[in-house]
Structure formats: structure tokens, C-alpha cells
Amino acid sequence: LLQMFSFCPCSSHADTDRFTWDLRQEDMDLDDLSRQLQDARDSLQPLSSSPVLRYLQGRPEEAESILSQSEEKIRECYGEKSDLRLIVMYGDLAWLKYHRGDYTQSQNYYKRVQDFQHPTGSPAVLHPEVYGEKAWTFLKFSVSYHHKAIDCFCRALELQPDASEWNKGYTIALYRTEPDSPATKQLSRALDLDPDDGFLLALLALKLAAHHKHQEAKSLVERALLLSPDDPQVICHVGRYLRQQGQLDRSIDLLQRVLRRSSRSHFIHHQLALCYRKKKLNLFTRRQSTVAQRGLD
């Protein structure tokens, strides 16, 4: 019993649970994060990130409940590769059980982490799935963590250079932090590995349009709409592209349609507001031009 109470997962496997990754509440907007996770509810990312959000919101019981329900969904998604995908989840449960006083279960989960934690036997090397999970968490939780996300995706790619998931994550992180060529180059690589990813297609279209490659950008946008017509994240970026190209009515129609499915999406509301603002400015400019022309007449 004494040995059980002296065990503390926060010091023994800090690289494999989110609660020890220095995710500070002051660095993030919890309400906005909650909306983002709701928008992405069809993917596994909310499943992995929601427990930390619930804990930061002062709801540890919900955090533990979500984690306890996660294993089956992860196994359904990843099949025989799910053990490596479960390392961080088991680490989260070990930490949470310990801090809620369930030392026996905490140690059981910690032992599961130990079974898979280091692929080479070296404590300096983790599985790419752990680096990837850490990177996605940093990318999702706060803009101030995006450079940490880049570092973690790079570590995952060192071990699995052709993994489409790590290339996609690295692409998104670069897109949000690098202004020009590095992100564009990585977007192209990620799409070579996963050519049917509507989100990446929309991101690359925005980059190409910024470099005046309008025909190629337009083609990518239409393909993104064909592949992901109801994905709020894809439509948000497509709507942004259309607004920048002056297609305000089409942008508004798409954004309003997807808004009916994700009514709390901050990003879609923001893009709609920008569209209406631009329409108002266009109307004002036309009126000013008409008044000026009448003055000349």
C-alpha cells in the first residue's frame, strides 16, 4: 500500500499524458476551444482533447468518463494499430485516477503505458503516435503552442516521414505560423500523400490565390467542395476564399448552409460577418460613386 501511494504518474511518464504538457488555462479561451471541438465532433480529435478541456473547466468526473469510453472507439478506428494510439489515453487515465485518489487503477494504467512507451528501449525516443498526439493537442489548444506543435510533428515525421496524418498536421501548423513558401511546399507534399483531403485542398487554394495562381486555386476549391460539402472547417476556408475573390453571395450561401449544422461555430460566424461587412462597403462605395457622377453631370 505504501508503494502504491508513493507512485506518481506525473513524474514517471510526463511525456505520455496531456495533463503534464504544460497546457495553461491562461493561454486559451475555453469557450472557443469547446466550440472548436464541437465543430470537429465527427473526428477523433474531440475525443482526445475533451477530457483536458473538461478538467480545466472544473469537471474531472466528465473528463474521466470521456476517457473511459474512448478505448472502444479508438480500437474501432485503428484496429491492430490501436495499442500505440492508446498510450496517451492510458497516460491521461493514470494521471487522472491518481489525482482523484484511485491509486490502484492509476498504477494499472501506468503499467500499460510502460509496456509500449519507448519503441527502441531508449527513454529519449517515443512512438510517433505519441509525438503526433502531443502535436495535435498543442495545435488545437492555443495559438501560443503552434511552434511546439511544429516541433512535435517534426519528431513524428523523423520516425514516419510518409505518414499522411503527421504530414497533414505539420502542414496546418506551418500554414498558421509561416507566411509563404514553407507552408505551400508542405501543403503540396501532404496532398500527394492524401489527395482527397478537402481541408488541405482549401488551405492550398488560399495560398495559391495569394500568389495570384487563380485558375489552380479555383480548381482546388471546387474539388474541396465536391469531397467535403458539409465539413464546417472546409466550408469556412472555402467561404474565405470566395469572399476574397469577390463571390460574396456564394460565400454567404455556403456558410449559412453549414451554419445550420454547426450553429455555434465561431469561425463560420466570423466569416459571415466579414462577408456582410464587405457587401456593405461595396454598397457604400457604389453610392458614393453615383453621387460623385451626378455632381459631374
Label every model-predicted segment.
Residues 1-297:
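Non-TPR docking regions that flank or precede TPR/alpha-solenoid scaffolds in eukaryotic proteins
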